[in-house]
Amino acid sequence: MMSDEQANWPQEQCFASFKHCLPVCRESVYSQFFEAFREDIKVKRESAAVKNLKIIFDATFELASKGGFDAMSLRDLSQSTGISMGGLYNYISSKDMLAQMVNDFLSQRLAPLAYSLNLESGSPRQRLATRLRIYIYMGSLFRPWYRFVYMESKSMARQQRDQAKQFDLIDTAKLKELIEEGVAAGEMHCSNSELTASALLALIQDWYLKSWKYKQNETSTDDYANFLVSLMDKLLADNDQQTHDQTGYNDHSGKNNQ
């Protein structure tokens, strides 16, 4: 069990405290999904619907990772889940609908829940570091969802492809905005905020798109988040002055220094 101090996000910025404070987890995500699409799902008994939604999407993510979403048919999904075609139609009417549901759920439910844990005050550097950590922590918790959106968007309908691109543009713009705030405040030094934001986002996406590599290297979620924040400081620091943490916690350990 976590102590009150350990659960004190955002002062204690580690994966454990984030999970403790985030109002959704791997186990509850399908209850949230059912609530989001209650009007579209024909099965109205929540317990039965949540159980089958987990089966359907776990199988979808697995089939897509092995052979690609484009090659997957609803018949393949039926065989993998053991749910009849008629049963599947109680939850999804088509592959396009399935892909759209995943995109909408990420952008309209999961992302807002995560961003509610962003720092509302503090320096641009503190807010940027917190946002980077949130991206990494969410990528660890909901890796199959993020991987599906970014890896399979090329084989989706145009609407889903455009939506996936928009996710990327929005995230890049937010990182760029925080970098430019830091530069304006004299806290950061950056000659190209657009490229720096894009580079940071690419490292975030690498975390959940190539998880096998980090698992093989035994890199933990906190290891990667600490590395990314440390790299951010190096990229944005004045060459003549070493950037130091002003938040009261150590970015390299996730532990409070006070």
Give names to the regions the model predicted.
Residues 1-49, 245-258:
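N-terminal intrinsically disordered/low-complexity leader segments
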Residues 140-159, 211-212:
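Amphipathic alpha-helical segments used for helix-helix packing
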Residues 138-141, 181, 197-219, 232-245:
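Amphipathic C-terminal alpha-helical segment
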Residues 63-97:
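Helix-turn-helix
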Residues 51, 55-62, 66, 80, ...:
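Alpha-helical structural segments
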